[in-house]
Amino acid sequence: SYIYKMRTAVFRMSCTYGTRQFGLEEQGWVAWFIIATLFNRPITIYGNGKQVRDMLYVDDLVDAFNSFLNSKLERGLFNIGGGPSNTISLLEFLDELEKLAGKRPKVKFADWRPSDQKVYISDTSKLENTLRWKAKTSVRDGIKKLFDWVKGNESYFSI
């Protein structure tokens, strides 16, 4: 990019979720938990469920991309996630799902896996300071948007 004078940015993304996500147990866990809850499928939680993640709604990710495109920066490397203000534990997420679905998700607990992180929160300060970007969608609002979309499109997920 430097040789050819191409504007380039790398965004290191974490836990992006949103409407039109077809989550699987091993990838896209936010959508997977919602799909599993609506279809009475079991959810396996490795560890105690207290692990914390920052969550980034897809619309906010697109806003970050556009912030770079509309800037005068030639290049950039940015961490992007929900940041400290958009965190949730797996147990808190299950509580949110119960409120939305009107039923408790079916959950089974298994042993921690060697690669499981107990806490992951992206440091988005460079992105915030350089591009004046900040995630706008709260975790709870984003979960509700995705839940409503999955519920409104259940035929996509039935087996």
Task: Go through each PLM region and give its residues.
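Glycine/proline-rich active-site loop of Rossmann-fold NAD(P)-dependent oxidoreductases
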Residues: 6, 16-32, 39-41, 45-46, ...
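C-terminal "lid/loop" region of Rossmann-like NAD(P)-dependent oxidoreductases
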Residues: 48, 75-79, 91-94, 102-119, ...
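Non-catalytic, hydrophobic alpha-helical segments
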Residues: 61, 65, 80, 90-93, ...
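Conserved C-terminal active-site "lid" loop/helix of NAD(P)H-dependent oxidoreductases
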Residues: 58, 77, 113-134, 141, ...
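Amphipathic terminal alpha-helices
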Residues: 139-159
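Active-site-adjacent segment of SDR/Rossmann-fold oxidoreductases
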Residues: 1-8, 36
